[in-house]
Amino acid sequence: MAKLTQANEDYLEAIVMLAGADRLPVRSVDLASRLGVSKPSVNKAVTLLKEEGFIEQQPYGDIFLTDAGAAYGEAVLERHNTLTRFFTEVLGVKADIAENEACCIEHVISEDTFQRWTEHIRQSLDCCPAK
């Protein structure tokens, strides 16, 4: 599976959020609104994501996640949510700062490092409950 740029991971993550668990179709206009970008920017990203096999779309139609796209996007979203929760709930970082920093880190942390980190946190919290 190809490694996407940070921007394209953001598009895929947003598609996953908009599609929801039922993988509903996503409209380009909703994607543009969610990310605060122009429709031409969405079209460019959608073209690349189609070429990489992460989404399907008929000309000017709704966007559908492929299995590969859902897996990749859900992994990015999981990293984002886990990092955000760690920053806010464990470290006490303000929500807006935690959100921004999680968005930066989610794109550069490897899957291996993320899995090892989450396992370490789980073990640390299980063995050392808050007083």
PLM region descriptions:
Residues A2-V37:
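N-terminal helix-turn-helix DNA-binding core of bacterial DNA-binding proteins
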Residues Y11, L31, V42-E52:
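Basic amphipathic alpha-helical segments that dock to polyanions
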Residues S28, V46, T84:
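Helix-turn-helix DNA-binding elements, focusing on the entry/boundary residues of the two helices
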Residues P40, D96:
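Key DNA-contact positions within bacterial/archaeal DNA-binding proteins
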Residues K50-Y60:
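A short, conserved structural fragment
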Residues G61-H80:
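Basic, amphipathic "hinge/linker" alpha-helix immediately C-terminal to the N-terminal HTH DNA-binding motif
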Residues N100-K131:
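C-terminal regulatory/oligomerization modules of transcriptional regulators
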